[in-house]
A protein has these predicted regions:
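Flavin-dependent oxidoreductase catalytic cores
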Residues: 1-386, 390, 394-406, 414, ...
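Short loop/edge segments at beta-strand edges and connector loops
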Residues: 295, 413, 435, 451-454, ...
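A short helix-to-beta-strand connector/capping loop
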Residues: 310, 442-449, 483-486
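Rossmann-like dinucleotide/flavin-binding elements
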Residues: 380-408, 450-458, 464, 472-482, ...
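N-terminal Rossmann-like dinucleotide/flavin-binding domain of flavoprotein oxidoreductases
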Residues: 417-463
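N-terminal Rossmann-like NAD(P) cofactor-binding module of classical short-chain dehydrogenase/reductase
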Residues: 469
Length: 525
């Protein structure tokens, strides 16, 4: 094992659950369930791959503990025994591939969509979420029903073979709505003070312990803070929630962040490293049980956090989406083999905004692990790939990994194509990590790289390949101008190292690329 990452690979424990390392696949909406909430082969393949790649703990995405608590189309369901066979198969494939298996339980509350459930949303108070209808305020009877539902779903998870359960009281889900003053305006014993707003969490753990006993690990995920939320959870409140959770009998706490605007919850390329770590560290000082932290963390950052004693477990969500083999590669001393997450948020855009199954711009095999499993070529062939952008780099790498003899031809002097251009934008320098990954992997897999070469048809014929793959990109659209010399495509402007002096520049369009270009040009002028 590489000593550089020694803390990352120390064994850990949550309650009675021994875990081989400190790397956790956190629960994330993947959209791989069926429309009626059943586990699918696609879901099993996804989770099995992350377990096989070396994660110590795999937590399955939020499943619905209460009938009708659905926020998204492909939401897993654990509200009835009819879902037990699929849940059992899912827990089994995770454990059979070397990881501990847990599942998250989460109800949408006021975020429930009537179009999916046929019923009105419910919440602690009749306060509508953004772009949602006004929820019905839950009665005391409704709260008791919800409490029983969470407890029964936890028991169902235990019966299915899961080794732990996480109660989802973070982001914008039902339980987080009770914790936040912004969504909980109740005047009874479930509203007002920190202890009152946390009361439902005490009720849930008490009801759960009656069914699963004291040895089954149950922990909680909360918002360490709520951004852009008047009356939202503060750090002082989350520290108190953590103390109350430990006193109530939860076995650990996982720290995330919340906001009615997902952009503030999901960390982007522009987010500073370890954004939530100081919050987790402050909470850790208040409790003695384990603290888990998330937020665009990779192996290097995770090692730093553990070494500093700022958390006990590292949740690597998108990092493990991009490369399920991250833990084993790092443990073997080959971090350069880890495919980095470019943080372009196509995953979030698909899952949260479009409500379709998640895909990854860096990992085409995400959610298709079995379908896209690489097989050795029956007969190695000579392959020429034209184009050194991401598509060409991936094509060259995959064909080489299968055993073919590959030559990559790129017209420019550098590889990366549009991604390299995008990496010039302010705040997007980390995109170069994906290009660097490809360069290293192509060299390791024996790909011959020709840069500064314009691949003509005659040139390709002269190379006598068995197969030619064209990945030369597309032509950029350019706005018409009276003087054609004054009209430049966004990508060309990004590619220029300097801007001519003494000229006025107009950027036409207000999309992300245009704004980034304007920002970049102000640095050069």
């Amino acid at each position: 094992m590489d000593a550089t990452y020694s803390r990352l690979f120390e064994a850990g424990r949550i309650g009675t659950l021994d875990i081989k390392n400190r790397i956790v696949l956190p629960p994330m909406l993947m959209g791989y369930g069926s429309e009626d909430g059943y586990v699918t082969e696609r879901a099993k393949d996804y989770y099995a791959a992350r377990a096989r790649g070396g994660a110590g703990l795999v937590i399955v995405e939020a499943s619905m503990p209460l009938p009708g608590g659905k926020m998204f189309q492909f939401y897993l369901d654990s509200s009835d025994d009819r879902y037990l066979p699929g849940l059992t198969e899912l827990a089994t494939v995770i454990k059979d591939n070397g990881a501990r298996a847990a599942i998250q339980l989460g109800d949408g509350g006021r975020e429930v969509r009537r179009a999916l459930t046929g019923r009105a949303p419910m919440g602690p108070s009749p306060i509508a979420a953004r772009k949602r209808e006004q929820p019905i305020e839950m009665t005391l009877s409704d709260i008791r029903t919800a409490t029983r539902g969470f407890a029964q779903a936890a028991h169902r998870a235990e019966r299915a073979g899961f080794e732990g359960v996480e109660m989802h009281a973070a982001h914008v889900y039902l339980l987080s709505q009770f914790l936040s003053r912004s969504t909980n305006h109740r005047t009874d014993r479930y509203g007002g003070s920190v202890a009152n707003r946390f009361r439902i969490m005490v009720d849930i753990i008490d009801a759960t312990r009656e069914l699963v006993g004291g040895d089954f690990p149950v922990w909680l995920r909360i918002n360490g803070v709520e951004y852009d939320t008047p009356g939202g959870v503060t750090l002082e409140e989350s520290r108190e929630f953590a103390r109350l959770a430990e006193q109530a009998g939860y076995d650990a706490i996982s720290i995330s962040a919340g906001s009615p605007h997902y952009e503030a919850t999901i960390h982007t390329l522009y987010s500073p490293p370890k954004l939530l770590v100081p919050i987790a560290a402050a909470i850790k000082r208040e409790v003695s049980f384990p603290v888990m932290v998330a937020g665009r963390l990779d192996a290097e950052l995770g090692q730093q956090v553990l070494a500093a004693g700022e958390a006990d477990f590292i949740a690597m969500g998108r990092a493990l989406m991009a490369d399920p083999g991250l833990p084993d590669k790092v443990r073997a001393g080959h971090p350069e083999d880890v495919r980095p997450c470019p943080c372009l948020l196509d995953c979030v855009n698909r899952g949260v905004l479009r409500d379709v199954p998640i895909a990854c711009m860096a990992n085409a095999a995400l959610g298709r692990e079995h379908e896209y499993e690489l097989q050795p070529a029956e007969k190695p062939q000579r392959v020429v790939v034209v184009g050194g952008g991401v598509a060409g780099l991936e094509a060259a790498l995959v064909t080489a990994q299968r055993g073919h003899h590959v030559t990559l031809v790129e017209r420019g002097e550098e590889l990366g194509g549009q991604l390299r251009i995008a990496s010039r934008a302010p705040g997007k320098g980390d995109l170069r990590k994906l290009i660097d990954f490809y360069v290293v992997q192509l060299e390791k897999n024996g790909v011959r790289i020709l840069t500064g070469k314009n691949a003509t048809a005659q040139m390709i014929r002269d190379m006598e390949p068995d197969v030619a793959i064209l990945a030369s990109g597309a032509a950029a659209a350019v706005a018409p101008a009276a003087d054609p010399d004054c009209s430049v495509a966004v990508v060309d402007a990004m590619f220029q190292s300097t801007v001519p002096t003494g000229r006025s520049i107009v950027v036409i369009g207000g999309d992300t690329r245009s704004c980034e270009l304007a920002d970049l040009l102000t640095e050069d002028v």
